A protein has these predicted regions:
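Hydrophobic transmembrane alpha-helices of multi-pass small-molecule transport proteins
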Residues: 58, 113-118, 129-146, 271-288
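Membrane-interface interhelical linkers
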Residues: 3-25, 33-34, 38-79, 89-98, ...
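Hydrophobic/aromatic residues within transmembrane alpha-helices
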Residues: 37, 46, 94, 99, ...
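Selected transmembrane alpha-helices and immediately adjacent juxtamembrane segments
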Residues: 155-185
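Signature of the 12-TM Major Facilitator Superfamily
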Residues: 45-49, 102-106, 131, 185-189, ...
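Structural signature of hydrophobic alpha-helical transmembrane segments
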Residues: 13-26, 67-84, 124-139, 183-195, ...
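Alpha-helical transmembrane segments of compact multi-pass small-molecule transporters, enriched
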Residues: 52-58, 106-120, 193-197, 229-232, ...
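Transmembrane alpha-helical core positions of polytopic small-molecule transporters
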Residues: 27-28, 54, 80-88, 111, ...
């Protein structure tokens, strides 16, 4: 009986790691295609339209697989939406004023660190092997977005990177607080709040945000990747420890870099390759541990 129980726990943890990895892949692909779409469209419009699409798709999933969410679950979902919008807005502002090699690593580190702290405070107790993977994940997160060329001053965009990291980290941590029987409606609210908040920021900055014109189909498809990412992450938190699944999900820049190399033939430098290798080792250790 004890052996069967341990096997069931092992399968559950493996499923959590697989779902977190699927979330990381979806987030990475979302960033890749979002970056391409934003070259010809307003990033604020792309974000607003994609989040509205994601909210609608998640609501459909919620109707197909209903749960029993309470007021607290919707409160966590709404708070996560505000945090996510802060993260997105700060990231875009940081990338427009500083270098990706400064902003992205700082934001990625914060996205992993905040839920790790929250998970540990909530009683998560990873194994020594999993801890090794968690420790390796942080340099991977920092190294993967690095590009060659001149190094920018660390202060350039660093403040926005910190705010973005805190926002994304809070998003992960808050999603992890949604009840296991709450279904998916709370995260549909998350995406709706992100869309409304980002649109409000765009209005305040006098930036175009309203989806209009032709060629919106790719933007809507981009939104479905956001649905997949958030649904997979929510399911991962229900199957495993927030400490572990958030670290795996925060490795999403690795899939963005890999897609850029495969599709756009962008060169992967030695530093980035080291980051990708560390990310792969971290995922294996966290999963096995």
């Amino acid at each position: 009986m004890a052996g069967g129980g341990r096997a069931a726990v092992g399968r559950r943890l493996l499923m959590a790691a697989a779902l977190a990895l699927a979330a990381a892949l979806s987030y990475g692909l979302s960033d890749f295609f979002g970056g391409i779409l934003s070259k010809t469209r307003s990033v604020w419009m792309v974000t607003t339209a994609s989040q509205l699409t994601a909210a609608a798709a998640t609501a459909i999933i919620a109707l197909a697989a209903p749960g029993d969410p309470g007021p607290a679950d919707f409160a966590w979902g709404a708070a996560a939406g505000i945090a996510g919008a802060i993260g997105i807005s700060a990231l875009y502002r940081g990338l427009s004023r500083g270098r990706m090699g400064v902003v992205a690593p700082i934001s990625g580190t914060g996205a992993a660190l905040v839920p790790v702290v929250v998970g540990l405070a909530s009683g998560d107790n990873p194994s020594p092997l999993a801890w090794t993977g968690i420790v390796l994940a942080f340099p991977a997160i920092i190294l993967v977005p690095q590009a060659g060329g001149k190094r920018a001053p660390v202060a350039t965009g660093a403040g926005y990177g910190v705010v973005a990291g805190l926002g994304f980290g809070a998003l992960f941590a808050l999603i992890g607080q949604i009840g296991t029987d709450a279904g998916f409606l709370p995260i549909a609210l998350t995406q709706l709040v992100v869309a409304a908040t980002v649109a409000s920021v765009a209005v305040a900055l006098h930036q175009p945000w309203l989806p209009r014109g032709r060629g919106l189909a790719p933007v809507f498809a981009f939104g479905l990747l956001g649905t997949a990412a958030l649904v997979c992450f929510l399911l991962a938190t229900r199957a495993g420890m927030l400490t572990i699944v958030s670290v795996i999900a925060a490795l999403y820049p690795a899939s963005t870099v890999a897609m850029a190399a495969i599709v756009l033939r962008e060169h992967i430098g030695r530093v980035q390759f080291l980051g990708l290798a560390l990310a792969a080792i971290a995922v294996v250790l966290v999963t096995v541990g």
